[in-house]
Design a protein with these regions (language model features):
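His/Asp/Glu-rich metal-coordinating catalytic cores
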Residues: 1-121, 125, 136-137
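Conserved residues at the C-terminal ends of beta-strands
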Residues: 2, 85, 146, 206, ...
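A short helix-to-beta-strand connector/capping loop
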Residues: 18-22, 34-37, 163-166, 180-181, ...
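Short gly/ser/thr-rich secondary-structure transition/capping motifs
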Residues: 22-24, 63-70, 162-169, 183-188, ...
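Binuclear metal-ion centers of metallo-dependent hydrolases, dominated by the metallo-beta-lactamase
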Residues: 29, 76-78, 90-178, 246-284
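Conserved beta-strand elements of the Class I
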Residues: 40, 54, 64, 117-121, ...
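Short, well-ordered alpha-helical microsegments
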Residues: 50, 72-73, 127-131, 193, ...
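C-terminal regulatory/interaction regions
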Residues: 169-284
Length: 284
């Protein structure tokens, strides 16, 4: 894993002991030898620290694991065998929008800041991506967040993200900003959506929206289709560019692995199988 991944994992679960001597972190592009194999991490455009893994054996066979990625800014690893994510592996999972969703999101937040605090709900990693988007767009209002989101955000800053003024929602500054409905952006995990900021402008970000880049889901609440995963077309394109002769689709986290394998065989004529055969758990 990368150092950033290790640090994020520890921030999310302090029971993990990832700084033990047996745990080795790697930099992107640095190859290490393990027995007769060589292992290299390749950057993936997903969240901070995300990486693809390339393993080369003594015979020159290249096996790659894509991890989670967005294809636009992820270098494709050419390989003989590819293990590819399948979060949006169904042909129904396509985002063919004619607008820049990131620009749309920034504009929506800027407009709603005129009315006070804006609440943004999403998942760890994606929340920090939105923070960086706003800072890059010169949105300078304070960012307010609960403890866990704050800890993840501080890790992101340690690894190069520049996120400006941050306040804990439980500190005096945070309480004054939220309690007084002053201009700020409050970042909360999606699990908090049911009970936080109910009387304010609210924006939820999710990759599971394919019909519209933005739609209203409540009186002052909107869903924005911002994803940190490739859609179906992006997954197919990655497989095509990888020139893999054999593909294994990840069928553990979501149930689209088998569908994606079938579509790879049909569209690309490449041998593909979903593993495990029975899906594991479903994640958002």
């Amino acid at each position: 894993m990368t150092k950033a991944t290790r640090d994020l994992a520890e921030a999310l679960d302090d029971s993990l002991k990832l700084r033990d001597a047996v745990i080795e972190t790697l930099e992107y592009g640095k190859t290490v030898r393990y027995g007769e194999e060589q292992i290299t991490l390749v950057k993936a455009d997903h969240i901070l620290g995300a990486a693809q893994v390339l393993v080369e054996d003594a015979g020159g066979i290249r096996v790659a694991y894509s991890g989670d990625f967005r294809i636009d800014d992820t270098p494709v690893v050419e390989c003989d065998v590819l293990v590819v994510e399948a979060t949006y592996g169904s042909p129904s999972c396509r985002r063919s929008f004619d607008v820049d969703v990131r620009e749309l999101l920034v504009t929506m937040i800027e407009k709603r800041l005129r009315g006070g605090a804006v609440y943004v709900f999403g998942y760890h990693g994606k929340l920090q991506e939105i923070m960086q988007l706003l800072r890059n767009a010169d949105v300078s209002v304070p960012f307010v967040m609960p403890q866990r989101v704050y800890e993840v955000t501080k890790v992101c800053e340690q690894h190069g993200m520049q996120l400006g003024c941050l306040s804990l929602s439980t500190d005096m500054d945070g309480r004054e900003l939220l309690g007084g409905n002053l201009p700020c952006v409050a970042f909360y995990h999606m699990n908090s959506r049911g009970y936080v900021g109910l009387n304010n402008a609210r924006i939820c970000v999710s990759g599971w929206e394919f019909n519209s880049p933005c739609r209203q889901i409540g009186d002052r609440e909107y869903l924005v289709a911002l994803s940190d995963h490739s859609d179906f077309d992006g997954l197919i394109e990655y497989v095509k560019r990888s020139r893999a002769k054999k593909v294994i689709t990840d069928n553990y986290r979501v149930s689209h692995g088998a569908v994606l394998a079938k579509e790879i065989r049909k569209r690309l004529g490449v041998s593909a199988v979903a593993m495990p055969r029975t899906p594991g758990q479903t994640t958002l």
